[in-house]
């Protein structure tokens, strides 16, 4: 009897430590331990602190999995992109397990795993290729042309800040704890959105740039804070969110015109944003957005994508 495909997925690219058991492309357990509370004071991730937390959390997480690791068939880990120290901790842990258990080791691209996370718990027959892979997270903002599980072509990326990073910096200026994306999204009111409240970034469609919008928004926050003691941030939050998401969608529209994809695959922490999902639904293409359990960094998406690659090799 053939052994089931049983993959351990390891995620340590930023501040979330993730371990998951994926058996025959089904998520059997998924442990995520975040160190975000340790980064609240700085308003962003401190790489050295995050790496030390991974060292402690990986051993706790593997105990919490409550799984006999000798039954694994493969070990997969996020190898790039990410914070160097955090990646090193995850890679060392994965290599050590691979050596001790004599199991095959698969290095996995973190962004590709985000893209295909929208297929978790889905019928894979829904996948239509070529597709556009949309990555919108705290560390990355990009669009990929997805030709197969193995072949992804980068067609647009940020030249400075990622969307999620801007959300966190704007949220910090408004007095919100890190991470701030969900708080800003909760304040969104379409009725408060005004034309030209902020100037939309002007860039080539193959590049995103959000540093200018970030500066506009921070200056506006300073003006409002100087003139008011009690502040309702709803108007500013609504216009900020509309501007930054609409700009991203403009790039997606250009990519659709150029590459004629059959569907959209959406992943990353910002994919949980309500306005983003609303705008994507207007693009007249089938789309899949990752379940909220899998939008932030997690081991399940690493193990799941590894399973897709392994099965592809078998076929």
UniProtKB/Swiss-Prot annotation:
Keywords: Acyltransferase, Cytoplasm, Iron, Metal-binding, Transferase, tRNA processing
A Gene Ontology biological process term: tRNA threonylcarbamoyladenosine modification
EC number: 2.3.1.234
Cofactor note (record): Binds 1 Fe(2+) ion per subunit.
EC main group: transferase
Binding site for substrate: 135-139, 168, 181, 185, 273
Transmembrane region(s): none
A Pfam family reported for this protein in Swiss-Prot or TrEMBL: TsaD
InterPro entries reported in the protein's UniProt record: ATPase_NBD (IPR043129), Gcp-like_dom (IPR000905), KAE1/TsaD (IPR017861), Peptidase_M22_CS (IPR017860), TsaD (IPR022450)
Classification via SUPFAM superfamilies: Actin-like ATPase domain
Molecular functions (GO terms): iron ion binding; N(6)-L-threonylcarbamoyladenine synthase activity
CC cofactor: Fe(2+)
Record's catalysed reaction(s): L-threonylcarbamoyladenylate + adenosine(37) in tRNA = N(6)-L-threonylcarbamoyladenosine(37) in tRNA + AMP + H(+)
Entry's family note: Belongs to the KAE1 / TsaD family.
PANTHER family noted in UniProt: TRNA N6-ADENOSINE THREONYLCARBAMOYLTRANSFERASE, TRNA N6-ADENOSINE THREONYLCARBAMOYLTRANSFERASE, MITOCHONDRIAL
Reported function: Required for the formation of a threonylcarbamoyl group on adenosine at position 37 (t(6)A37) in tRNAs that read codons beginning with adenine. Is involved in the transfer of the threonylcarbamoyl moiety of threonylcarbamoyl-AMP (TC-AMP) to the N6 group of A37, together with TsaE and TsaB. TsaD likely plays a direct catalytic role in this reaction.
Entry protein name: tRNA N6-adenosine threonylcarbamoyltransferase
Organism annotation: Mycoplasma genitalium (strain ATCC 33530 / DSM 19775 / NCTC 10195 / G37) (Mycoplasmoides genitalium)
Species lineage: Bacteria, Bacillati, Mycoplasmatota, Mycoplasmoidales, Mycoplasmoidaceae
């Amino acid at each position: 009897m053939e052994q089931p495909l049983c993959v351990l997925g390891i995620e340590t690219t930023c501040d979330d430590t993730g371990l998951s058991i994926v058996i025959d492309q089904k998520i059997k357990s998924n442990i995520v331990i975040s160190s975000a509370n340790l980064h609240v004071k700085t308003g962003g991730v401190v790489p050295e602190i995050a790496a030390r937390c991974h060292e402690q959390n990986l051993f706790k997480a593997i105990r919490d999995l409550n799984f006999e690791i000798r039954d694994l068939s493969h070990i997969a880990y996020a190898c790039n992109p990410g914070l160097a120290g955090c990646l090193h901790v995850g890679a060392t842990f994965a290599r050590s397990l691979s050596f001790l258990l004599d199991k095959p080791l698969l290095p996995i691209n973190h962004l590709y795993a985000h893209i295909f996370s929208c297929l978790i718990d889905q019928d894979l027959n829904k996948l239509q290729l070529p597709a556009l892979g949309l990555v919108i997270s705290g560390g990355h903002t990009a669009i990929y042309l997805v030709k197969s599980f193995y072949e992804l072509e980068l067609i647009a990326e940020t030249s400075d800040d990622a969307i999620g990073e801007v959300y966190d910096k704007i949220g910090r200026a408004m007095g919100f704890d890190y991470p701030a994306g969900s708080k800003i999204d909760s304040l969104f009111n379409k009725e408060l959105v005004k034309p030209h409240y902020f100037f939309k970034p002007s860039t080539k469609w193959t590049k995103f740039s959000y540093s200018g919008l970030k500066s506009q928004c921070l200056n506006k926050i300073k003006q409002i804070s100087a003139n008011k003691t009690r502040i309702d941030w709803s108007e500013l939050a609504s216009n900020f969110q509309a501007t930054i998401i609409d700009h991203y969608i403009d790039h997606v529209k250009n990519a659709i015109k150029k590459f004629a994809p059959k569907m959209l695959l959406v992943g990353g922490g910002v994919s949980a944003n309500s306005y983003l999902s609303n705008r994507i639904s207007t693009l007249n293409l089938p789309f899949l957005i990752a379940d909220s359990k899998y939008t932030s960094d997690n081991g399940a998406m690493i193990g799941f994508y590894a399973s897709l690659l392994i099965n592809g090799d078998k076929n």
